[in-house]
From Swiss-Prot:
GO terms for biological process: Ras protein signal transduction. Keywords: Guanine-nucleotide releasing factor. It comes from Pongo pygmaeus. PROSITE patterns: RASGEF_CAT. This is Rap guanine nucleotide exchange factor-like 1. Pfam families: RasGEF. InterPro entries: Ras-like_GEF, Ras_GEF_dom_sf, RASGEF_cat_dom, RASGEF_cat_dom_sf, Ubiquitin-like_domsf.
Length: 456
C-alpha cells in the first residue's frame, strides 16, 4: 500500500475506526477482547503514522478518542471496582431517585430483593446481566446464613409474580431479568412444590383512597419534571439498543436494558394517571384531576415530550377511567375539546398520520413516542429479509440507518428547563421519579365501579 493510493486506503480505514469508536464508546467495554483488538489496531496505526505524514491528524484524534472511551484491559486477578446503581424503585430511597440517571450496562451491579413464599426476602448484590442460575446461587448463599431451615434453599426456582397474581417461571439460562420485570412484579425464589401457592406482595394490592401528592403540585412543575426525567432516560438509551431490541428480541436483552427501562417508565406513567384518578373519591375533585392531567399533557406537548404526552393521554383513555361518565360531564367544555384533539393526535389510524405530522415540524430536543419507533423498525425488519440470495439487503439496512439517524437528530441539542425556581422543586422531583401505581386492570375496574356503578 505504498504511495498516494495506499495512504488513501489507510485514511479510509482509520476514518471508519474513528467513527466506530465515537458511536459505540462505552458499549465496547461490555465486549470481551474489545480492548485488546483496539489496542492492537492503535499500535499498528502508530507504526504507519511515522511513514505517512497524512495520518498524523487522524492518529491524534484516535489517541484522544481511545482515552475518552477508556478501553482498559483489566489485569489478571484484579476485580473491577464498580458502584452499585439504583433501579427505578431501589428501596424507595429519596437520594437514589434524585440522582441523574446514567446508562446501565450488563456488567453494572444493582441491589435486588428476592422474596420467599411467606413474603420474607433476602437482598442480593448482582450484575444487571446475571442469569437466573446466578441469582439463585446468590439467594442460596444468603439463605445458608439465615435462621431458616437448611432445606429451604434446596431445588429453588425463580418466579416473576405480578400484582395481579400472574406467575412466570424463569429458565436458568435467562439473563437480565431485572429490567424485564413488570411495574409491580417481584422475583420469588421457591421450590416447585410451593409454586402454585405464590401470591403478590400485600402492599401491591392495598389501596388507600384520599388526597395524594398530585393534588398539591402544579401542572407546570409536574410536566417539566416528567420531561426532564424522560430526557435523562432517553439519553441513556444507545441508538444500537433500538436495533438490538427489534433484530435480536430476548437474545439481546443484555444490550437493551436502558430501552427496557424507558418502555417500563412509559407504562408506569400511564398507570399513574389512571391510579390517581380512580383513588380520588370526591366527584368534584376527580373532575379537577382530569382537568389537571389534560393541562399536564398539553404542557408536555409544549415541551416536545411526546412520550409523556402519549402516556398521560393513554392513562386518561384507560377503560376504567373513560367510563366515568358523570365525572367527565363535570369537565368544562374547553377541556373536553382539548382532550378530543389530543385523542385525535394519538389516534393510530393511517399509520399515526397526525402524530407524524406534528413531530416532523419539531426541532430538537425532542422526546418521541418510543414504542412507535420500535413499531417502525419491526415493520422494516419483518417486511424484508436481511439476506437475499446470500447477499446483504442494502436497501433494508439503509432504511434502518435512516430511522437511527432520526433518533440521533432528536437528541442533537441539549434540553434546558428552569425548574429550580419552584419552592417545592426537590419534593416534586422525588414524587415524579417514584410513582406509586396500580397496574392490575381488574383492580382499577373495581375502583371505577365503586365510584360510578351505573356509568355507561
Amino acid at each position: 500500500m505504498e504511495g498516494p493510493e495506499g495512504l488513501g486506503r489507510k485514511q479510509a480505514c482509520l476514518a471508519m475506526l474513528l467513527h466506530f469508536l465515537d458511536t459505540y464508546q462505552g458499549l465496547l467495554q461490555e465486549e470481551e477482547g474489545a480492548g485488546h483488538i483496539i489496542k492492537d489496531l492503535y499500535l499498528l496505526i502508530m507504526k504507519d503514522e511515522s511513514l505517512y505524514q497524512g495520518l498524523r491528524e487522524d492518529t491524534l484524534r484516535l489517541h484522544q478518542l481511545v482515552e475518552t472511551v477508556e478501553l482498559k484491559i483489566p489485569e489478571e486477578n484484579q476485580p473491577p471496582s464498580k458502584q452499585v446503581k439504583p433501579l427505578f424503585r431501589h428501596f424507595r430511597r429519596i437520594d437514589s431517585c434524585l440522582q441523574t440517571r446514567v446508562a446501565f450496562r450488563g456488567s453494572d451491579e444493582i441491589f435486588c430483593r428476592v422474596y420467599m413464599p411467606d413474603h420474607s426476602y433476602v437482598t442480593i448484590r448482582s450484575r444487571l446481566s446475571a442469569s437466573v442460575q446466578d441469582i439463585l446461587g446468590s439467594v442460596t448463599e444468603k439463605l445458608q446464613y439465615s435462621e431458616e431451615p437448611a432445606g429451604r434453599e434446596d431445588s429453588l426456582i425463580l418466579v416473576a409474580v405480578s400484582s395481579s397474581g400472574e406467575k412466570v417461571l424463569l429458565q436458568p439460562t435467562e439473563d437480565c431479568v431485572f429490567t424485564a420485570l413488570g411495574i409491580n412484579s417481584h422475583l420469588f425464589a421457591c421450590t416447585r412444590d410451593s409454586y402454585e401457592a405464590l401470591v403478590p406482595l400485600p402492599e401491591e394490592i392495598q389501596v388507600s383512597p384520599g388526597d395524594t401528592e398530585i393534588h398539591r403540585v402544579e401542572p407546570e412543575d409536574v410536566a417539566n419534571h416528567l420531561t426532564a426525567f424522560h430526557w435523562e432516560l432517553f439519553r441513556c438509551v444507545h441508538e444500537l439498543e433500538f436495533v438490538d431490541y427489534v433484530f435480536h428480541g430476548e437474545r439481546g436483552r443484555r444490550e437493551t436494558a436502558n430501552l427496557e427501562l424507558l418502555l417500563q417508565r412509559c407504562s408506569e406513567v400511564t398507570h399513574w394517571v389512571a391510579t390517581e384518578v380512580l383513588l380520588c373519591e370526591a366527584p368534584g375533585k376527580r373532575a379537577q384531576l382530569l382537568k389537571k392531567f389534560i393541562k399536564i399533557a398539553a404542557l408536555c406537548k409544549q415541551n416536545q415530550d411526546l412520550l409523556s404526552f402519549y402516556a398521560v393521554v393513554m392513562g386518561l383513555d384507560n377503560a376504567a377511567v373513560s367510563r366515568l361518565r358523570l365525572t367527565w360531564e363535570k369537565l368544562p367544555g374547553k377541556f373536553k375539546n382539548l382532550f378530543r384533539k389530543f385523542e385525535n393526535l394519538t389516534d393510530p389510524c393511517r399509520n399515526h398520520k397526525s402524530y407524524r405530522e406534528v413531530i416532523s415540524k419539531m426541532k430538537p430536543p425532542v422526546i418521541p413516542f418510543v414504542p412507535l419507533i420500535l413499531k417502525d423498525l419491526t415493520f422494516l425488519h419483518e417486511g424484508s429479509k436481511t439476506l437475499v440470495d446470500g447477499l446483504v439487503n442494502i436497501e433494508k439496512l439503509h432504511s434502518v440507518a435512516e430511522k437511527v439517524r432520526t433518533i440521533r437528530k432528536y437528541r442533537s441539542r441539549p434540553l434546558y428547563l428552569d425548574m429550580e425556581a419552584s419552592p417545592h422543586h426537590l419534593q416534586t422531583k422525588a414524587y415524579v421519579r417514584q410513582f406509586q401505581v396500580i397496574d392490575n386492570q381488574n383492580l382499577l375496574f373495581e375502583l371505577s365501579y365503586k365510584l360510578e356503578a351505573n356509568s355507561q
